[in-house]
Amino acid sequence: MAFLDNPLIILAHIRQSHVTSDDTGMCEMVLIDHDIDLEKLYQSSVPGENSTQMQSNGGETQGYVYSQSVDITSSWDFGIRRRSNTAQKLERLRKERQNQIKCKNVQWKDRNTSHSAEELGSLFERKNFKERDLNHGKQSILSVRLEQCPLQLNNPFNEYSKFDGKGHVGTTATKKIDVYLSMQTSQDKLLPMTVVTIANAKVHDLIGLICWQYTTESREPKLNDNVDAFCLHIAEDDGEVDTDFPPLDSNEPIHKFGFSTLALVEKYSSPGLAAKQSLFVRINAAHGFSLIQVDSTNVTMQEILEKALKRRKGSQRNSGPQYRLEKQSQPNVPVDLDSTLESQNSLEFCLVRENSSRGEEHPEEETQIDIATVQDMLSSHQYKSFKVSMIHRLRFTTDVQLGISGEKVEIDPVTNQKTSTKFWIKQKPISIDSDLLCACDLAEEKSPSHAMFKVTYLSNHDYKHLYFESDAATVNEIVLKVNYILESRASTARADYFAQKQRKLTRRTSFSFQKEKKTG
């Protein structure tokens, strides 16, 4: 390390050892300004007698200071040297030689031998492409496959073949379903037909795919060309159709249903098959009723009683309390179980326990079940969701998604980013089994845009109430749907709830009567 006190030497050292030029030239201007200032300062500090000597030395020093170094250049390309003319000429010659290699010179020579016109014509013979023999040539694989599968061309359900998922396994979400075919003979009906469909297909598309595969496999009997003539029902593993539930909605996607076994059933909508239309028998019981589906009126009352007892949870024919059937219009008159439904001239009966009576009732006129009401009752078991507001104790509301099906009621909170939940308790999802539901009542209806209903259910041996609000149309639909589900299920919790409610009402009436008697 060196210590210098002479600014002139420092400036000279910077010029000789460093690059002081840039694109703007500002660095050189700064150094030159310092040189001028130092020169004036040095001349003013020197006595007059030595002025001549210092002028001579200053001239040498000034020349030394302003002398440019070899390393100082005017730009950053000081390390690049221009190519000489010889190098450029050699590069041009090299490119010309490469271009000459790509060219081929052909020397033209006159022919020594003479050829006739026929020989010359055979060299470039004209061919007629219009006259082509169609019998010659190899047959394509597509033509061979079309000849081997003549039914593929005549299949009326070809438009549904695009929903076949056998060629999409591993690449697209698919669903494998075993389908029982009710229209086949008794032996073929026992074996299901395996169908692989893409997951985003609808139920209507799956029905068309089943018909397409049925026709492709040349099964008998032949199907109706109309896909709307069929429907899909839930089936057991042994192929028995579960008639307790309605058919799957044709507009819903198939991935919404988690059933791996279904049954293809014909709707019997044509006038010629009206005799095969299913009938519904209403069986009234305590705090509810059941709808029994029968194929014809030739079924015995014993079979209807067994189906009605099977509907009741925990009730068996050979164990527990015994039951009998009575006509709704004829109380305390048991029905002959060996007789047929046709001989009863009624479709509404009452299920009564043995050695008991349902009381003296006034004979009622025989009521015919409305088919539209039956369809509403059956469709009530299908899943449907509603967006409502749940009312809490502090009267604040929470938006929830209310999902209702024949098995359970689900309450899922709807997350809203705009609503702050800092001061409120976060709503948790709630799932209520249908056997634990007790009641669903309309609590308040102020206007068509605002109504409130109450849901009562059993939880840990205690009855709890949930309040919801929405527009009047939605509330009425929810109340009607839940009540249809409650009436079609003989729930023990619902029966106990009404019994407890009746006891409270009786106790309240008795208390008020005694109070009036004392005051009187």
From Swiss-Prot:
Pfam families: CRIM (PF16978), RBD_SIN1 (PF25322), SIN1 (PF05422), SIN1_PH (PF16979). Keywords: Cell membrane, Cytoplasm, Endoplasmic reticulum, Endosome, Golgi apparatus, Lysosome, Membrane, Mitochondrion, Mitochondrion outer membrane, Nucleus. A 1,2-diacyl-sn-glycero-3-phospho-(1D-myo-inositol-3,4,5-trisphosphate) binds at R393, K428, K464. GO terms for cellular component: cytoplasm; early endosome; early endosome membrane; endoplasmic reticulum; endoplasmic reticulum membrane; Golgi membrane; late endosome; late endosome membrane. One of its GO terms (molecular function) is phosphatidylinositol-3,4,5-trisphosphate binding. The keyword Cell membrane applies. It is a peripheral membrane protein. Residues 382-487 form the SIN1-type PH domain. Component of the mechanistic target of rapamycin complex 2 (mTORC2), which transduces signals from growth factors to pathways involved in proliferation, cytoskeletal organization, lipogenesis and anabolic output. In response to growth factors, mTORC2 phosphorylates and activates AGC protein kinase family members, including AKT (AKT1, AKT2 and AKT3), PKC (PRKCA, PRKCB and PRKCE) and SGK1. In contrast to mTORC1, mTORC2 is nutrient-insensitive. Component of the mechanistic target of rapamycin complex 2 (mTORC2), consisting in two heterotretramers composed of MTOR, MLST8, RICTOR and MAPKAP1/SIN1. Contrary to mTORC1, mTORC2 does not bind to and is not sensitive to FKBP12-rapamycin. The CRIM domain forms a ubiquitin-like fold with a characteristic acidic loop, which recognizes and binds AGC protein kinase family members substrates. The SIN1-type PH binds phosphatidylinositol 3,4,5-trisphosphate (PI(3,4,5)P3). It plays a dual role in mTORC2: in absence of PI(3,4,5)P3, it binds and inactivates MTOR. PI(3,4,5)P3-binding relieves the inhibition, leading to mTORC2 activation. Belongs to the SIN1 family. This is Target of rapamycin complex 2 subunit MAPKAP1. It comes from Xenopus laevis (African clawed frog). The lineage of its organism: Eukaryota, Metazoa, Chordata, Craniata, Vertebrata.
